[in-house]
Regions:
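A short, N-terminal "cap"/entry segment at the start of jelly-roll beta-barrel domains
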Residues: 1-75, 183-272
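Intrinsically disordered, low-complexity, charge-dense segments enriched in Lys/Arg
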Residues: 158-168, 172-195
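Short, conserved beta-strand element in jelly-roll/cupin
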Residues: 76, 81-86, 94-114, 152-156, ...
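A short hydrophobic beta-strand segment most commonly corresponding to one strand
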Residues: 100-102, 130, 144-163
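Histidine-centered metal-chelating micro-motifs
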Residues: 89-91, 109, 128-129, 133-138
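Short acidic-glycine-tyrosine-enriched beta hairpin
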Residues: 114-133
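Short histidine-centered beta-strand/loop micro-motifs
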Residues: 67-72, 89-95, 112, 120-122, ...
């Protein structure tokens, strides 16, 4: 079990608990999650066109007006999820704030770098990766069945959007999708055009691309990956801080992440 902070205010109705209306507005059941299949610029690109995107807390960085946001209030971070069939991948992109993934189901390959060749790691169910901010990253379901990963993005606005690798924008245009400089998608297959005053999202210059980090796996995996079996052992009697300034994966992304087991759940809520 994962716990995030800062936590939602549970006394907002002034009587020590949530009202029914407030609770419903801040609750999203797994069976109620509504996917969006046109969330990002690669929605028509072969190999990436079967993705499902879920925005659970906050709007995340979805580029589609069709995206359903389940819980609109954000406590300093956004939580979303991606569901993908086998061999479906999410194209190379970067964020200006933290992006943390927790594997809910399946087997996933995460890769990074300008062309996705700088390094990679394979994660199993329960594993966590805190991808370094400012590098191009992508991920692919390499399991045999439909897989799902949860994502946590730092900031109430999740950093304000996505920066795509140039080849992703070019491939998308060949399949009818254009991203405006307002971070919204326009589908030429549906007869959509860029509105007046909106230009295509510019691709990064060669100068900016040259400054993008290309860390090798040896620099990323030890400080940015936490394995489920290790977490279970470390959190056997008391919760372990996975992400935070003094955590297992040291970082200050604007939120903290703890891992709690049945054996440590009692001490998780004990007064400190």
């Amino acid at each position: 079990m994962l716990a995030f902070s800062p936590a939602l205010d549970l006394t907002q109705n002034g009587r020590g608990g949530l009202s029914t209306g407030s609770f419903n507005a801040n609750y999203a059941g797994y069976g109620d999650l509504i996917p969006c299949k046109t969330a990002f610029i690669d929605a028509h690109t072969p190999g990436s066109d079967q993705k499902e995107n879920f925005t659970i807390i906050g709007g995340g960085v979805s580029e589609s007006p069709d995206q359903h946001v389940h819980i609109k209030d954000t406590p300093g971070f956004n939580i979303g999820a991606a569901g993908q069939p086998p061999r479906c991948r999410n194209s190379l992109h970067s964020h200006t704030t933290a992006e943390v993934f927790f594997v809910l189901k399946g087997r996933w390959r995460f890769f990074w770098g300008r062309w996705g060749k700088a390094g990679e790691v394979v994660l199993e169910e329960g594993d966590i990766i805190n991808i370094p901010t400012g590098i191009f990253r992508g991920f692919e379901n390499i399991g045999l069945d439909y897989g799902m990963i949860m994502a946590v993005l730092g900031g109430d606005d999740a950093g304000g959007g996505v920066t795509w690798a140039p080849q992703v924008i070019q491939d998308a245009a060949e399949h009818g999708l254009i991203l405006g400089d307002n971070s919204k998608l326009y589908d030429s297959k549906k007869g959509q055009k860029l509105p007046e005053g909106i230009s295509p999202m510019p691709i990064l210059s060669d100068e900016k691309l040259a400054k993008m980090p290309e860390p090798p796996a040896i620099d990323v995996i030890p400080r940015h990956v936490a394995r489920y079996l290790d977490l279970m052992g470390l959190a056997g009697k008391s919760p372990i801080k996975v992400i935070g300034e003094d955590a297992m994966l040291p970082d200050k992304p604007g939120f903290e992440m703890d891992f709690i087991t049945r054996g440590s759940s009692g001490s998780a809520w004990a007064p400190r």
